[in-house]
Amino acid sequence: MKKMTSIAILGLLIAATGVAYAETLRAITVEQNASYALDTDSLVQSNGKTAFSVQTVFTSKMKAPNGAEYTKATNTFLADCKAKTQALTGVSLMDGSGKVVYSYNPTVTEAPMIAPERNSLDAKIMQTACGLK
């Protein structure tokens, strides 16, 4: 029931922004102060890897590295579903209106392909994305 309520809140928050979203979101999990959903429209496979993005909606304002406040995030990942590894390839943090207040694209050295810890948020994200490919 808690997950359904959080997913409903996620939907309301997205609708409340007044921005049209073309994504088809699939709930991943609700943890601490945020809801996580896979953008299934973002799934792209190439050379044995799967690229995808995850939308996050926070229940309270967060602070970006540059000091800006944000309530939403879009993180992009590259996963090797067979090897069970993934890497973070991009971060975009948005305020309540959907305006990007901070973005970051790590290098391969900064964010290498790694196997997420069992039952971690990253493991849940990869399991959801790889399960839909």
What are these regions, as identified by a protein language model?
Residues 9-10, 20:
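Cleavable N-terminal signal peptides
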Residues 15-17:
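N-terminal signal peptide c-region/cleavage motif recognized by signal peptidases
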